[in-house]
């Protein structure tokens, strides 16, 4: 089945190839998460169906149960394919321009209805605000219109370069969330003054540990418009801290 081609918005500076336009249309559909009637009767691909053993002395009232072996969950309820997930896995081969495709998606599906990031507590200024930074008390965020990109350290600059190259001047604000600039970016993000934040898996892991102890990480204190996990196979072992940190991120849309 041939997918329809979708043109990116005028803010996108590059010319997409036909297959990239098809990918953009597919990704937009995945983010809208409109289930078909067939999806509601299909078993979710991450779940497996099993039958209870038939014995005379055991009657549980149902004939089947469902297992998700990836997260270890059991359920007696049918798990349909359409469970409101927005996003997916962009599994094209290397060299086909996956970063450019995702850049076109960021431009096409911007968050228009969500409010800008708002601190949960009252704004502070002056010396008191600076003291809160030194003691690690970042603004606690409810919801953001920004996209969070998590990538290996070696790819952070490449992501920023590609996003800026794909955007007309002044149409997309891109920042690296790493090292000493994290405190300044936390407050820029809290005022809705950035569209894309790029960080590393190492920073994500460190902030996750900090958040578990003190609850003071911007990355985990609110809901992102979109989270993109680049090179997601690096966290395929779900028992690692990096994998747990990635799962802990709250987002309306997720891509890997």
Predicted regions and their residues:
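Conserved ASCE P-loop NTPase core motifs with emphasis on AAA+ ATPases
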Residues: 1-3
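ASCE P-loop NTPase motor core, strongest for the SF2 helicase catalytic module
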Residues: 5-256
